[in-house]
Amino acid sequence: SDAAAALDWVQSLHPDSKSCWVAGYSFGSWIGMQLLMRRPEIEGFISIAPQPNTYDFSFLAPCPSSGLIIHGDADKVAPAKDVQGLVDKLHTQKGITITQKTLPGANHFFANDSELLLDECADYLDRRLNGELADPRPKRLR
């Protein structure tokens, strides 16, 4: 896939890196999660405005890594209730920590909320890499 080829390319530029993360927005979050399932070196993820109402995320059983799911409560493309259903399913899995952030008033495109989105993602990364939210180097469930 294109995502796997992109990851291979990035890893070729940084051969000494011991880990990596994946992030995706909308359909890209589904692609990123597919990649997460196939690549054991991926230690975490950020899924922005995933669309479980459109794309099947049932392959995330079990989800091998902890991560952030962030979305807006005014998203009409990926309704909050559908994203909540995905988060609820992931919360039942052992060995991972799923952090959910719901941005009040934010739509699917985060119009007028892009700075808040960036701040929330940066805060999550800082806290996660400091070991506050989940083990910074989790053991994968494989």
Where are these regions (language model features)?
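Alpha/beta-hydrolase fold nucleophile elbow
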Residues: 14-25
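Catalytic histidine neighborhood in serine/cysteine hydrolases
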Residues: 90-109
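Gly/Ala-rich beta-loop-alpha elbow adjacent to hydrolase catalytic centers
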Residues: 24-32
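Catalytic histidine-centered segment of alpha/beta-hydrolase-like enzymes
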Residues: 106-118
